[in-house]
C-alpha cells in the first residue's frame, strides 16, 4: 500500500470479512489517491468508512442476489461520483444467470439492478459509472 501511494498508483482491493484490518492498514500506510474496493461486499457502515477515505466502491453481480440487502443499502448511500459497475467474471454471475460462469455481457444485469436501487435510469447509471471509471483510470484527459 505504501509503495503504491508513494508511486501514485491505484489500488484495487478485494476485502472479504476483514474490514477492520483493511481500514487499519490504509490508515497506517496512507490511502493511495485512486483506491477502489473491487467487488465490494460490505454494508452501509463499510461503505461510509471507505467513502470517508475517498475510496471508490465497485459493485458486482452480488448486488442482484436476494440475500444482499445490506450491499444494496451501501449502494444507495454511495455518491454518484464514487461508484463503478463490474461483473467479476467468471465469478458471481448476477441474477438471472446464477449458477453459470459469469461473462462481461451480463454487466447489464448488474447495471439494471444498481439503477433500480438508486432510483435512476440505466442511462444515467451508465454515464456516471463511465465517468467514474474514466477518472479513476486516468482516461478522462
Where is each model-derived feature located?
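Glycine-enriched alpha-helix->loop->beta-strand junction motifs that scaffold or abut catalytic
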Residues: 27-34, 49-60, 79-82
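Catalytic beta/alpha-barrel core
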Residues: 12-16, 34-42, 61
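Active-site glycine- and acidic-residue-rich loops that bind
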Residues: 58-73
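Short acidic/histidine-rich active-site segments
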Residues: 81-103, 125
Amino acid at each position: 500500500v505504501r509503495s503504491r501511494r508513494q508511486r501514485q498508483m491505484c489500488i484495487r482491493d478485494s476485502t472479504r470479512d476483514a474490514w477492520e484490518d483493511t481500514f487499519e492498514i490504509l490508515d497506517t500506510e496512507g490511502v493511495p489517491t485512486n483506491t477502489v474496493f473491487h467487488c465490494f461486499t460490505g454494508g452501509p457502515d463499510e461503505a461510509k468508512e471507505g467513502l470517508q477515505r475517498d475510496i471508490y466502491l465497485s459493485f458486482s453481480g452480488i448486488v442482484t442476489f436476494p440475500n444482499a440487502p445490506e450491499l444494496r443499502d451501501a449502494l444507495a448511500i454511495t455518491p454518484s461520483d464514487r461508484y463503478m459497475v463490474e461483473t467479476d467474471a467468471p465469478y458471481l454471475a448476477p441474477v438471472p444467470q446464477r449458477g453459470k460462469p459469469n461473462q462481461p455481457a451480463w454487466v447489464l444485469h448488474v447495471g439494471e439492478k444498481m439503477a433500480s436501487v438508486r432510483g435512476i435510469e440505466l442511462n444515467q447509471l451508465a454515464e456516471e459509472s463511465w465517468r467514474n471509471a474514466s477518472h479513476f483510470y486516468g482516461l478522462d484527459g
